[in-house]
Amino acid sequence: MSDSVNLDEPSTNSTHFLQCLVTEPRKELQGSRDTHVSYLIITKTNLSIFTRAECKVRRRFSDFVKLQEILSRMNEDCVVPPLPAKHKLEYIKGGRFSDNFINRRAKLLNRYITRCALHPVLHQSPHFIAFLENPNWNNYVRFFIQPKLNNTSKLDEISDSLLNAFSKLKEEPTEFDIQRDHVQQFMFGISNLEGSIQKLLRLEKALESDYEDVSIQFDRLASLDQALDVPIESIQNALQQTGTEYANLTEKLTLLLDTIKDVESYAHSLKELLKRRDQKQQDVEALQEYSAKLSLERDKISSGGSNGFSLSKTLDDLRGIDHNDTRLKRLEHVQSELQAVEQAIQEASAVHDAFNQRVREESKLFDSVRQSEMLSAISDYANVHVEFFTNIRDLWIRVKQ
């Protein structure tokens, strides 16, 4: 996917763009306890919401984590792109400070920033803009953002989720049910593809090792008898270079695997958004159910209630309490509460309807980004194999000549 994002509708004549690039990873404070890697972020844009047309800042991974937290907490109706796993050490030798790991993480962070830049809501967030251009990001977070995050407690969000975790929707709209199934099937397919590629990686690594072993044996054979009338040295070199080609192929296939894992995480974010949509609907349904109970109670009080024996009524008689006055006060209280609940239903329904519309837009954006990224990854995969087999063919043609 291109790092340059056109932010205009097709029908507009002007061209607004936002170009973000994460590049040049650099190890900082090496040898100390605070050793870390910083990444250069270059932003070019003509959007008026930015203070500069071009800016460069350096951010470490923990800064990206904080940005992710801010965007997620303050944009609950959006699919906020996921960050790569903090310790993504599969297929890595040398740990998180190895060049291989650092370069792979830089590519994943670049995809993360590009996804945010593509998003019609997130790219306008003042916090995202500050991340891209504010040289004092840590102070910005400490004094302007952290107090807001503290006021919107994560515990409250978890509590709301737990309250709705054991309740089911009375009737889920068909369109969102279809979306959920679509995402689930996509994640299932991606998971199967990931497993197949991991299997292929193991086979290619084994071939790399086997070609290296055969190359060594040919080298030993050549040293035993220099008079052999066969191009043993050429064969040995071709075998060795074939192993090297497999090593290069494995490295590039690992990058494809990173992309697939990243797209799978992105799909999971959409799945979580659909869950939050369900919570909004459950809020409305719970209020409607409570309103129905209050209406029944109001009607019961209005009709005079039960004419049978009532212990509370008998006690009120002994105390000389006016039953009609008590009934009117109860009726007034229930009507007041019912009015408040009806107002809450209207507000919750408005939030629910707006959330539904946002989910529709997020789903379309996700499909667009997913298709673009997968098409790019598959195209790269094909080109890598064309290059691989071309190089292998050329190697052995030279041996034959």
UniProtKB/Swiss-Prot annotation:
Residues 190-292 form a coiled coil. The modification Phosphoserine is found at S62. GO terms for biological process: endocytic recycling; mitophagy; piecemeal microautophagy of the nucleus; protein transport; reticulophagy. It comes from the Eukaryota. A 1,2-diacyl-sn-glycero-3-phospho-(1D-myo-inositol-3-phosphate) binds at R60, S62, K86, R105. GO terms for cellular component: autophagosome; cytosol; early endosome; endosome membrane; Golgi apparatus; phagophore assembly site; phagophore assembly site membrane. One of its GO terms (molecular function) is phosphatidylinositol-3-phosphate binding. It is a peripheral membrane protein. It is found in: Cytoplasm, Cytosol; Preautophagosomal structure membrane; Endosome membrane. InterPro entries: AH/BAR_dom_sf, PX_dom, PX_dom_sf. Its main location: cytoplasm. Residues 17-139 form the PX domain. Keywords: Autophagy, Coiled coil, Cytoplasm, Endosome, Lipid-binding, Membrane, Phosphoprotein, Protein transport, Transport. The PX domain binds phosphatidylinositol 3-phosphate which is necessary for peripheral membrane localization to the perivacuolar punctate structures. Sorting nexin, involved in the separation or division of vacuoles throughout the entire life cycle of the cells. Involved in retrieval of late-Golgi SNAREs from post-Golgi endosomes to the trans-Golgi network, for cytoplasm to vacuole transport (Cvt), and autophagy of large cargos including mitophagy, pexophagy and glycophagy. Belongs to the sorting nexin family. This is Sorting nexin-4.
